[in-house]
């Protein structure tokens, strides 16, 4: 019996999704916002496919929906689509605002990294020995006018939630990886809390992973 090799690389899984669901996952160009709860549909469609696991699918879907290309397509008046490319309703303004804020933050971080990298590269050249020049007499410059001090914005500190403080339809943040992800509580069963993320994913986590 021929065994099927399981895909583990996220890029390979995305390529597989592009090929399997071309009307939903767009490989190049402008993408379209995905249906809320699409992960469940995806898991059901690929339940008998031994190439991919639910965990790897979730990671690949998160990569797809957090890319700049995807976030740029989340704008007012746009409709979400299902696995077959069918329209599933217009985007809510709250989701549009969150996507644009996430995009802006991601682009600013990337810009800061580029500047920091450029600074490290130019530092050795700046420290190189320069020829000594004779001092040139200069006219005294007028004292520069004081620049207005920018007011620092207080950083929002998120703290772990207590299960008894949580309720349905409450806006929360879920600790996933390095940065918390915003979402809405759909249901609470015992110690498990079901949260619908703004990207469309629906996950189930313990209260300790929810931040307020």
UniProtKB/Swiss-Prot annotation:
PANTHER family recorded: RNA CHAPERONE PROQ
Q: What is its main location?
A: cytoplasm
In which residue ranges is the amino acid composition biased (Basic residues)? 130-141
GO CC term (a single one): cytosol
Assigned protein family: Belongs to the ProQ family.
**One Gene Ontology term of the molecular function aspect:** RNA strand-exchange activity
The record describes the protein's role as: RNA chaperone with significant RNA binding, RNA strand exchange and RNA duplexing activities.
The name this protein goes by in its record = RNA chaperone ProQ
**Cross-referenced InterPro entries:** ProQ, ProQ/FinO, ProQ/FinO_sf, ProQ_C
Spell out the SUPFAM superfamilies in the cross-references.
Answer: FinO-like
Q: Which gene encodes it?
A: proQ
Bias (Low complexity) occurs at: 118-129
Report the record's Gene Ontology biological process terms.
post-transcriptional regulation of gene expression
Location of the protein in the cell:
Cytoplasm
Source organism superkingdom: Bacteria
To which species is this protein native? Shewanella piezotolerans (strain WP3 / JCM 13877)
């Amino acid at each position: 019996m021929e065994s099927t090799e399981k895909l583990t690389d996220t890029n390979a899984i995305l390529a597989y999704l592009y090929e399997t669901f071309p009307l939903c996952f767009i490989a190049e160009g402008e993408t379209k916002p995905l249906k809320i709860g699409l992960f469940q549909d995806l898991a059901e469609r690929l339940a008998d496919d031994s190439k991919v696991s639910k965990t790897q699918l979730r990671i690949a879907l998160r990569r797809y929906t957090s890319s700049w290309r995807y976030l740029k397509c989340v704008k007012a008046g746009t409709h979400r689509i299902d696995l077959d490319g069918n329209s599933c309703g217009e985007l809510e303004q709250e989701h549009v605002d969150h996507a644009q804020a996430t995009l802006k933050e991601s682009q600013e971080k990337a810009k800061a990294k580029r500047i920091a990298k450029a600074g490290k590269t130019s530092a050795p050249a700046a420290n190189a020995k320069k020829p000594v020049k004779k001092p040139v007499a200069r006219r005294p410059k007028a004292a520069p006018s004081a620049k207005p001090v920018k007011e620092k914005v207080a950083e929002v500190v998120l703290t772990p939630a207590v299960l008894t403080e949580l309720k349905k339809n409450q806006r929360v943040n879920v600790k996933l990886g390095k940065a918390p992800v915003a979402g809405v509580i759909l249901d609470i069963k015992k110690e498990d809390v079901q949260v619908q993320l703004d990207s469309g994913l629906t996950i189930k986590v313990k209260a300790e992973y929810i931040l307020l």
